[in-house]
Amino acid sequence: MRIDAISIGKNPPDDINVIVEVPVGGHPIKYEMDKDAGALIVDRFLYTPMTYPGNYGFVPHTLSDDGDPIDVLICNTRPLVPGCVINVRPIGVMIMEDDGGKDEKILAVPAPKLTQRYDKVHNYTDLPEITLKQIEHFFEHYKDLEPGKWVKMGGWQDVDVAKKLIVEAIERYKTQG
């Protein structure tokens, strides 16, 4: 896969593309896309036997404060094939920090052309509270048993903050990527 050939989206930050690395409900394995080779590699086996609460990936042509493309958790119930590209719209962001520094997770839903299931979801607050708690629980604990790793949760922010972080990550990629 040539990652450089995949667009950010049709209208960022409102409409973005995500390259999926880990499927919802998959085995406790963290995959990452090798951006240079365009290949999906095994980053690590999670020490904690937990599954991802959504399809997880990144927005191409972005750069977060941690030096990686901006992370996205897609709220949907069907597992996507790692390496596929899905068009989504952001609905919020979970602020967190880990042993590597700031590590925000953009929360998104599939674009309306893919499914009508999320037509009324415009902000993270439109999701069921249990869904948000499950996401928080996963990211708060998925590194618990890994030596030297830690996570600190900073709470949820709305869609406007998510879009601002996406724009900043796009600009950072243009100047530093």
Swiss-Prot record:
Report the locations given in the UniProt record.
Answer: Cytoplasm
Decide whether keyword Transmembrane is in the record: no
Which residues does substrate bind? 30, 44, 56, 142
Q: What is its main location?
A: cytoplasm
> What are its GO cellular component terms?
cytoplasm
Binding-site residues for Mg(2+) 2, renumbered to this chain: 71
Task: Name the EC number(s).
Answer: 3.6.1.1
**BP-aspect Gene Ontology terms:** phosphate-containing compound metabolic process
Which residues participate in Mg(2+) 1 binding?
66, 71, 103
One of the Pfam families matching this protein, by short name: Pyrophosphatase
Entry's family note: Belongs to the PPase family.
**The protein, known as:** Inorganic pyrophosphatase
